[in-house]
Each structure stands twice: as C-alpha cells, then as structure tokens.
C-alpha cells in the first residue's frame, strides 16, 4: 500500500510490533520459517493451538467436546499479542485491543501501538 498509509490510525488485536518478549520471539521464529511477518491470522492459529494443548493437558488427554469446553472455560494465558482468556460464561475470547499508527521503521511500514484496552469482550454479548 505504500507511504500513503503513514499516520493512519487503526484498532486491532495484534501487531507484529507488539512490545513483549514472547512476541519478539514469535515474530523472529515465524519470519525464519515463512519469510514474512506474522499477522492476526497466524497469531490466532498460535492461540488456538495453545488453548487446545493446554485444555488437553487439563483433561488428561480426553477429547470429547464437553470435557474440552469445560477445561477451556476461564483459561488465561500470555499470547504474542498480550494476555488472553476465555470467558467462562460465553466461552468467547477476551483480549486486548490496541490503537495503532502506521509508521516506517527501518524502511518498512509497521502498525505501532500507542494505546490499549485490556480484556475486551464481544460487545454484542456483554450483559447490560
């Protein structure tokens, strides 16, 4: 898209520029394996696999749906995108949302975070 994107402000749940040790390692390993930066799709896959793995550990390897869902309710973990959890009532993901600005760093465009909303739930399911 080019330099015309510089300064654009967006809100999203992930940027490869997220400043955490886990994300830096994730970006490094992902780029090594794929020759491009990770994005929200790849980190979603990472989180999904992490959630399944941890749920299987909690269930002792039981794989039926009800047992796995029960194990996932209320789980909390550190993701490359920040602290994540599963709402025990709705079973939806609870995640940070970042306000980002497009900036050029080392000749590349990046979404750089400058504000954050923690523990954002699906607004259509939040009780009023």
Positions of PLM-derived features:
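Extracytosolic ligand-binding ectodomains
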Residues: 1-128
